[in-house]
Amino acid sequence: MKSAVENLSPTRVKLDVEVPFEELQPSIAEAYKTIAEQVQIPGFRKGKFPNRLIDQRVGRGYVLETAINEGLNGWYQNAVAETGLRPLSRPEVEITEVPDPAATDGELKFKVEVDVRPEVELPDYAGITVEVAPAEQSDEDRQKALDDLRGRFGTLKPADRPAAKDDFITIDINAKIADEDVDSATGLSYQVGAGTMLEGLDEAVEGLSTDEEAIFDTKLVGGEHAGEAAQVTVKLTAVKVRELPEADDDFAQLASEFDTIAELREDLVKQVNQSKTVEQGVEARDKVMEKLVELIEVPIPESVIEEQLEQHFDPANAHGEEDHDTEEHRVEVRENTERAFKNEIILDAVADKEEISVSQAELIDYIVNSASQYGMDPNQFAQMLDQSGQVPMVVSEVRRRKALAHVLGLATVTDTEGAAVDLSDFVKPAVDPELEAALNEAAGVTGEDDDTEAEEERVTVSADDPGAARF
């Protein structure tokens, strides 16, 4: 098989492929088997008759057409591997020449146009300089941390007064469209100001006393009338306030491992400091990424962006939002999509240059942390990723994070007061030693066999996921 590439643009190529007759033969043989299972010839068992009878029944041309249709994707994938292309989109195929069905020689020729990952030229990214806010904590930060902890142990007490922001209320609601009842619910619990129910609800209930009602106009967000304008009547049936426990030694013993409130406060100072340090690290990471994007020109394949936009604005994804597809929203989503594309291309290029790989321990550590964020069992989360074919995507994500951490480690980061910022915790993420030991034990890695060190198992999934061609 021969293949040649013509660059149409930095993100699009034309691939010319020639498949000699001898390489068509396996597909032709498979085509005969496929057709033999689909036709019936008197006097022969299904699938058990000579090829010449199939030629007589359906025609040699149909056999050749079937062979080409079944083999085309494989030849395309072979050409992609042979030329080192990294496709991003579905290929557009044009068959330009087929062998004469009556002949025993000839070539199959076809052309493919497809969007590919652009090549980028990396600058010297060592020593990128960025400035971030100081990791300082205030008295308000420390008090908020304590109050948040007290809130977790608070109790709700009835309040004999009108509802106010942050109160916990119980309500009944009824929705009407054109004076017709379309939905209702009773005994709903809600925190005033949360903004998690209907738009306009917070304003309607503030100031209401028990057994009072208010009427407001809004758009429904669920059910068969989602997105439709409705008139909603809300009745307040109870008001409660959260009563916080006293911040004393008893509370410290209840809410923590400490015996005194002084020890708890000291630990909260450490937690707030850690939180501020993380915020500072995130700011540095984001600014380093912004600098990379400024320094590196990344061509963007328009068709890939358009496909993602269409997926985002598919009516099935509107979730009842009438204003889901607006010009303003499209501009915002396009900008975010293009930014994400640039980030991926740049970080993949850095990972390639630095020969960054992903260890099994790093992959599972990422899965465990992600599962925790979703409140899922890590094993179930990993199984879900595997069944949905998302493991390569996760590997790529971890690899890009490591690439960005590498660049961040080479950067010069100072705060706005001129002090150097230590980002060692961000650029050298440590895998839990117990987790790594367990993984190695499960894999049979001991480091003692034949007096040689066992190398850490590495995930060898490709960072590319062009998908199979569909014609």
UniProtKB/Swiss-Prot annotation:
Residues 166-245 form the PPIase FKBP-type domain. The keyword Cell division applies. It comes from the Bacteria. Residues 442-471 are annotated as: Disordered. Disulfide bonds: none annotated. Keywords: Cell cycle, Cell division, Chaperone, Cytoplasm, Isomerase, Rotamase. This is Trigger factor. It comes from Renibacterium salmoninarum (strain ATCC 33209 / DSM 20767 / JCM 11484 / NBRC 15589 / NCIMB 2235).
